[in-house]
């Protein structure tokens, strides 16, 4: 059963009417309602504000990293553990094939249902998760296997244990080491890109975002609490932070926006997975035309350009 957001109420009503018409085998009514639905979807989703896009990025039915991995990879083989502490299930690492191309996919996994959410720590990685990602990336770099990173986290885990095991160092080391990888690297924000937790697997030759994903230094809830000390200002904060794919492309903070289905990846998962696959194949072909040193030079220049602004 579909989960509807507040701004989808009209869509929900039309879809319920379609179900009733189908049970009555009223084909003319179904045709009329389906055309009405198409117009309502276009009207609703072409006029979303940033807060509504944030809601879509966090939608419980939105495809997570493992959904993309199962749809993209053949002969997938998972890498476990950081060889120092434990295996952090908030980050998954799989070697496999996309078509005939051997790849490594690193993803942040939130989990579905109470049991898996707890196992995955709600998609908030600990230091050992980032160290596992780096271990797998180093292995891929050694054999020049391209890397696809799937970003989807509210942020790195802020618990005492994570801090004791040096969370900030783990993130900083990933930024440093991923910047120096010579194999082609592509990072895609598929849902929520929260702060350093997202940055740790975002340094890449190409950084893209799905149409309804978000990428921010702080959550709108955190911003609302700090700036206004008012939890009712979340929507204002979301619209002010410039966290959407469209905003960040205009600011040249990301390279590309992947056009997931207009109605959202949560409603048309196969189409969303296909769109990401097409982007990966196209981007990888472009990166393969460059030498490893040329890729490093372009990555360096891109990173050095971050932070430029206009008055």
UniProtKB/Swiss-Prot annotation:
Keyword Glycosyltransferase: no
InterPro entries cross-referenced by the UniProt entry: Acetyl_CoA_COase_a_su, ClpP/crotonase-like_dom_sf, COA_CT_C
Entry's EC annotation: 2.1.3.15
GO cellular component, one term: acetyl-CoA carboxylase complex
Catalytic activity: N(6)-carboxybiotinyl-L-lysyl-[protein] + acetyl-CoA = N(6)-biotinyl-L-lysyl-[protein] + malonyl-CoA
Subunit annotation: Acetyl-CoA carboxylase is a heterohexamer composed of biotin carboxyl carrier protein (AccB), biotin carboxylase (AccC) and two subunits each of ACCase subunit alpha (AccA) and ACCase subunit beta (AccD).
Protein name: Acetyl-coenzyme A carboxylase carboxyl transferase subunit alpha
Coiled coil spans: none
Keyword Lipid metabolism: yes
Gene responsible for this protein: accA
Pathway(s) where this gene product acts: Lipid metabolism; malonyl-CoA biosynthesis; malonyl-CoA from acetyl-CoA: step 1/1
Organism placement in taxonomy: Bacteria, Pseudomonadati, Campylobacterota, Epsilonproteobacteria, Campylobacterales
Protein family membership: Belongs to the AccA family.
Alphabetized GO MF terms: acetyl-CoA carboxylase activity; ATP binding; carboxyl- or carbamoyltransferase activity
Main location: cytoplasm
Protein's job: Component of the acetyl coenzyme A carboxylase (ACC) complex. First, biotin carboxylase catalyzes the carboxylation of biotin on its carrier protein (BCCP) and then the CO(2) group is transferred by the carboxyltransferase to acetyl-CoA to form malonyl-CoA.
Any Pfam family: ACCA
Compartments where located: Cytoplasm
GO biological process, one term: fatty acid biosynthetic process
Residue ranges of domain CoA carboxyltransferase C-terminal in the record: 36-286
Keywords, in A-Z order: ATP-binding, Cytoplasm, Fatty acid biosynthesis, Fatty acid metabolism, Lipid biosynthesis, Lipid metabolism, Nucleotide-binding, Transferase
